[in-house]
């Protein structure tokens, strides 16, 4: 699949819907497709080509929020493809993997797996974009510099060197320079994915898959135990700054602007939700109880707000796009955070 077809496929992505009897007297709702977000940036000056992936693990907030901040920037130099929410279902659920660990599905995945289309789209993005490097962003447990079993605050490599990729050399550059600006210091973790026996599972992960397909890749980890989301985002942006130096990437205004304005650039606003209930529109911007007659058909027509906004039914399979129900609460979320809710009751 070429890049044009990849982008087309991403917009046509569909998700499963359960089957119900036609004479069901309950309410019926149809939700929008979950977006597979991708943003391509190109500077006027030639530089490197970098692919940024966030959100493979849905409860790693600092990672996907930092990736998301890059979307609003323009490039002065180089090229970049940003996929900030690669596992949006898990982000909305605020769990590592709603359908299992997506970062163990790159070696092989069943077509029946709800993550299948997203994993395949990520693979196609990598192969069609042909980046100089892929950076997979995560928030890991603990502090690797203090605990050999921890992953937080680290640059993760699969080998010291893989083919002609000097992974340790580049990781060392990032570690040494980023540590000048971080209170909690970074370690380098070498999983020895292809030569060792401890982390064989990494062959199934994104970076291992990339290397096997001759694409250089690193994983960068902030710590889940940092005191705030601000600190996690800060850690990621400081690490990215060093990668950008190596790969000749320059942002208009500089990445330091993002680092200095993390809170200002992450202010949430309540989105406007437009429903269609039996053909009649209902616009909502705050919590409300809606009473509707039996057999009513409800459709979420639009969600107008920020990236990461979505309508999330409470206690319902998040892979479903449409279903029947009697009484249900719908959380209006930005990523993991509920901004308000809509209660719909059958009368």
Put a short name on every predicted segment.
Residues 3, 7-8, 22-347:
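Structured catalytic-domain cores with a bias toward divalent-metal coordination
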Residues 13-20:
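Hydrophobic h-region of N-terminal signal peptides that target proteins for export
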């Amino acid at each position: 699949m070429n890049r044009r077809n990849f982008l087309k496929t991403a917009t046509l992505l569909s998700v499963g819907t359960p089957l119900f009897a036609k004479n069901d007297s309950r309410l019926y709702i149809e939700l929008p497709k979950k977006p597979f977000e991708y943003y391509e940036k190109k500077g006027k000056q030639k530089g490197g080509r970098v692919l940024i992936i966030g959100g493979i693990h849905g409860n790693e907030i600092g990672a996907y929020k930092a990736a998301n901040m890059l979307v609003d920037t323009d490039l002065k130099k180089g090229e970049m493809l940003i996929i900030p929410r690669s596992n949006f279902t898990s982000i909305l659920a605020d769990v590592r993997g709603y359908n299992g660990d997506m970062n163990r599905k790159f070696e092989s995945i069943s077509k029946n797996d709800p993550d299948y289309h997203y994993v395949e789209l990520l693979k196609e993005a990598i192969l069609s974009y042909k980046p100089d490097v892929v950076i997979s962003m995560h928030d890991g447990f603990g502090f690797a510099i203090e605990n050999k079993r921890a992953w937080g605050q680290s640059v993760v490599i699969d080998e010291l060197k893989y083919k002609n990729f000097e992974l340790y050399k580049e990781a060392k550059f990032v570690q040494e320079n980023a540590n000048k600006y971080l209170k909690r210091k970074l370690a380098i973790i070498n999983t020895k994915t292809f030569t060792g026996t401890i982390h064989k599972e990494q062959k199934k992960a994104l970076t291992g898959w990339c290397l096997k397909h001759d694409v250089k890749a690193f994983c960068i980890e902030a710590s889940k135990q940092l005191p705030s989301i601000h600190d996690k985002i800060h850690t990621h942006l400081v690490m990215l700054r060093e990668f950008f130096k190596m790969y000749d990437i320059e942002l208009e205004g500089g990445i330091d602007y993002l680092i200095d304005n993390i809170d200002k650039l992450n202010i949430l606003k309540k989105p406007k939700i437009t429903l269609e209930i039996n053909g009649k529109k209902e616009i909502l911007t705050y919590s409300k109880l809606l009473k509707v007659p039996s057999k009513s058909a409800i459709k979420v027509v639009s969600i107008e707000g920020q990236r990461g906004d979505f309508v999330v039914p409470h206690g319902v399979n998040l892979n479903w796009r449409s279903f029947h129900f009697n009484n249900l609460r719908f959380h209006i979320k930005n990523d993991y955070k509920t901004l308000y809710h809509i209660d719909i009751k059958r009368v």
